Amino acid sequence: YYTVSSESYKAEAGAPPARKGEDQPMNIQWYPGHMTKTRRMIGENLKYVDVVAEVIDARIPIASRNPDIDDLVGSKPRVVILNRADQADPAASKQWAAYFRSKGISVLECDARSGAGVKQFSPVMRGALKEQIARWKEKGQVGRPVRAMVVGIPNVGKSTFINKVAKKKSAKAGDRPGVTRGKQWITVDQGLELLDTPGILWPKFEDETIGLHLAFTGAVRDAIMDVETLACHLILLLAQRKPEALTARFKIVPEEGMSGWDLLEAGARKRGFLISGGEVDLERMANILLDEFRAGKMGRITLELPEDLEREEDDHGTA
């Protein structure tokens, strides 16, 4: 099912114009029913694999991870695939790589669409299993293929990544979240076999920010939310994290005290998005902002850093 509720999220984008629907705060929930079955399938198939590769969006490494994965995978060797690294801030990606490695998780930065970095997948997977492979050799199991499970939430580019690795259209890729279904083993060169699983997402977001960040990148369909309110939250975050991107792309110079709605209106005026009576066309501006951010036209931007995760752990007393 798909829902958007206004019960718990206190919007920080500022006071919206007095227009129907725009004063609704956002608490995004996204959990199609087939994902319960998928989670069970992942748990049941873990015994058949040697290593788990988790594909995440390098722009939102916190929001694009499924917190259930840690419990599901347990002590299995892990590899995190920082996909769409071409759209993420390189310095931020280095911070994330260091963070995951400090947790004992191997890392691969890549862009599945162009194929950049994908060739390193097999070496990274084997590196994560170095000790296990040595034990296989001791037992005379030379040439035994590495068997891996590839997991990830919907719309992080998992199917595109698998297609690129396998050099063929094995898994059905689509732009809409939740398009990949079923189960299949995919044989990759160099003795690597992948078990493809549909992406999974938890039934309820633990933090409203998670839902927003997923929506910013398109992991949640725009049709289930108010796009103008969403764009206001994005433009406010960009003003805080990457103000120069707004200046370069929209000629906006964020000033202290400006709300998301102020910024969105300023951008609309700079682009000449006006309707009858000189009123700004906020809907058009909202869609343009989201489209250009998702397409990488605003430069390489990472919305989340390891320090955000550590701050969250401190807030919950789990550091």
Predicted regions located by residue number:
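Short terminal hydrophobic/aromatic SLiMs and anchors at protein ends
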Residues: 1-2, 8-12
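Helix-rich effector regions associated with P-loop NTPase G domains
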Residues: 9, 19-51, 59-68, 72-78, ...
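Compositionally biased, low-complexity flexible segments
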Residues: 15-17
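Structural beta-sheet core signal
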Residues: 54, 80-82, 150
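Canonical P-loop GTPase G-domain recognition
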Residues: 88-147
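Short, structured loop/turn "capping" segments at alpha-beta junctions
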Residues: 132-136, 163, 169-175, 241-246
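Short coil/loop residues immediately preceding or within conserved phosphate-binding loops
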Residues: 143-145, 168, 183
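Glycine-rich phosphate-binding P-loop
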Residues: 148-167, 197
